[in-house]
């Protein structure tokens, strides 16, 4: 099987694509997979480390640009269509997946024009511009939330969930305890702000420590700060003698998840998919500038099921965050109910479901 996975730009688009590739290789070890993205997208840094082949196209973003920038974007679209056609002619894929982001658009369109089966993945409640357009021509659409079906043709839309890395389900607690200096018997709080950290979350958590002093001997914290905030966040924990492992970046996220009892995080599609696949209680703080406000929508979906607590970014401060933490940790039944609701919401085998759809399309083509 020869497969192109197109799109990326951000982790929310890219990581489900990598997870899908992992599922494909698991079922078809001989599969040949190439990713197509842009030199400025996250894929340029991440894909080379995975061992997959990566090709670039010249497409530029369109949404939120000035008139002159939109003119440049349209010009880049024409060039990227030519580049996409060349990639497809050279590689001759059996199927093309679009994982979202503007880089997916010309590749999926070029595949459609060549009558190659295409599947687009929509990880959020409201599709972005690329997927709204591609949904009209794609062979199939894989969605994460039932509400999203209103944006696509029901006949070819499937509720699959967002693919996650299988490693997420296989965390090694014993390894994690050594890695993060975990003390048995304490409640572990994992704090994430995305791969670059999030200053607003860092500030709220450190300001909230004074409100969490009564819990100091019951909790321990793993905090990913981002490079810029590492030193001062580390010092805040040390000054108040909280048991905390503070890191600029967590490379062993699988192990961090395995020992976490409560996760404080943004609400990107990949993060939500991972948290629910492993049934973690969480406090979600949606990134307020995400396209179409999709992070808040993701978080509200979980909130409606009792799977998380929600704090809007504009309302976030130390006292508010500490109140949410106290509410959950002082009533063990609340955390247990959140864990069960989270697990019920999760779809850990989304990748396999999407592969089944691909197999069906390929059988029909024959």
UniProtKB/Swiss-Prot annotation:
Topology relative to the membrane: Peripheral membrane protein
EC numbers on record: 2.4.1.227
InterPro entries, per the entry: GlcNAc_MurG, Glyco_trans_28_C, GlycoTrans_28_N
Domain of life per record: Bacteria
Lineage, uppermost ranks: Bacteria, Pseudomonadati, Nitrospirota, Thermodesulfovibrionia, Thermodesulfovibrionales
Compartment(s) where it occurs, according to its Swiss-Prot or TrEMBL record: Cell inner membrane
Annotated disulfide bonds: none
UniProt keyword list: Cell cycle, Cell division, Cell inner membrane, Cell membrane, Cell shape, Cell wall biogenesis/degradation, Glycosyltransferase, Membrane, Peptidoglycan synthesis, Transferase
Family: Belongs to the glycosyltransferase 28 family. MurG subfamily.
Protein's name according to its UniProt entry: UDP-N-acetylglucosamine--N-acetylmuramyl-(pentapeptide) pyrophosphoryl-undecaprenol N-acetylglucosamine transferase
Coiled-coil boundaries: none
Chain's role: Cell wall formation. Catalyzes the transfer of a GlcNAc subunit on undecaprenyl-pyrophosphoryl-MurNAc-pentapeptide (lipid intermediate I) to form undecaprenyl-pyrophosphoryl-MurNAc-(pentapeptide)GlcNAc (lipid intermediate II).
Binding site for UDP-N-acetyl-alpha-D-glucosamine: 10-12, 124, 165, 195, 250, 295
GO cellular component: plasma membrane
Major site of localization recorded for this protein: membrane
Pathway stated in the Swiss-Prot or TrEMBL entry: Cell wall biogenesis; peptidoglycan biosynthesis
One GO BP annotation of this record: carbohydrate metabolic process
GO terms assigned for molecular function: glycosyltransferase activity; UDP-N-acetyl-D-glucosamine:N-acetylmuramoyl-L-alanyl-D-glutamyl-meso-2,6-diaminopimelyl-D-alanyl-D-alanine-diphosphoundecaprenol 4-beta-N-acetylglucosaminlytransferase activity; undecaprenyldiphospho-muramoylpentapeptide beta-N-acetylglucosaminyltransferase activity
């Amino acid at each position: 099987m020869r497969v192109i996975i197109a799109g990326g730009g951000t982790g929310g688009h890219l990581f489900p694509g990598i997870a899908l590739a992992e599922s494909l290789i698991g079922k078809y070890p001989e599969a040949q997979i190439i990713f197509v993205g842009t030199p400025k997208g996250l894929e340029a840094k991440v894909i080379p480390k995975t061992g997959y082949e990566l090709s670039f196209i010249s497409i530029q973003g369109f949404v939120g640009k000035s008139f002159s920038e939109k003119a440049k974007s349209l010009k880049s679209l024409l060039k990227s269509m030519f580049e996409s056609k060349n990639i497809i002619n050279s590689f001759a894929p059996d199927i093309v997946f679009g994982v979202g982001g503007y880089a997916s658009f010309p590749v999926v369109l070029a595949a459609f024009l060549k009558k190659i089966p295409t599947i687009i993945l929509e990880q959020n409640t409201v599709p972005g511009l690329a997927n709204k357009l591609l949904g009209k021509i794609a062979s199939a659409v894989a969605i994460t939330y039932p509400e999203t079906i209103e944006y696509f043709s029901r006949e070819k839309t499937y509720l699959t969930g967002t693919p996650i890395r299988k490693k997420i389900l296989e965390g090694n607690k014993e390894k994690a305890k050594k890695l993060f200096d975990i003390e048995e018997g304490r409640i572990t709080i994992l704090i994430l702000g995305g791969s670059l950290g999030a200053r607003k979350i860092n500030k709220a958590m450190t300001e909230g420590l004074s409100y969490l002093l009564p819990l100091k001997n019951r909790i321990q914290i793993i905090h990913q700060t981002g490079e810029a905030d590492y030193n001062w966040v580390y010092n805040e924990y040390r000054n108040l003698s909280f048991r905390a492992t503070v890191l600029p970046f967590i490379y062993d996220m699988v192990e961090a998840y395995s020992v976490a009892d409560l996760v404080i995080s943004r609400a990107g599609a990949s993060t939500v998919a991972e948290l629910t696949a492993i049934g973690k209680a969480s406090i979600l703080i949606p990134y307020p500038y995400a396209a179409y406000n999709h992070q808040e929508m993701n978080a509200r979906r979980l909130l409606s099921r009792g799977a998380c607590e929600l704090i809007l970014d504009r309302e976030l401060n130390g006292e508010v965050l500490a109140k949410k933490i106290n509410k959950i940790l002082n009533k063990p039944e609340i955390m247990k109910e959140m864990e069960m609701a989270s697990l019920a919401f999760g779809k850990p085998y989304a990748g396999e479901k999407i592969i089944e759809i691909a197999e069906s399309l390929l059988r029909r083509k024959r």
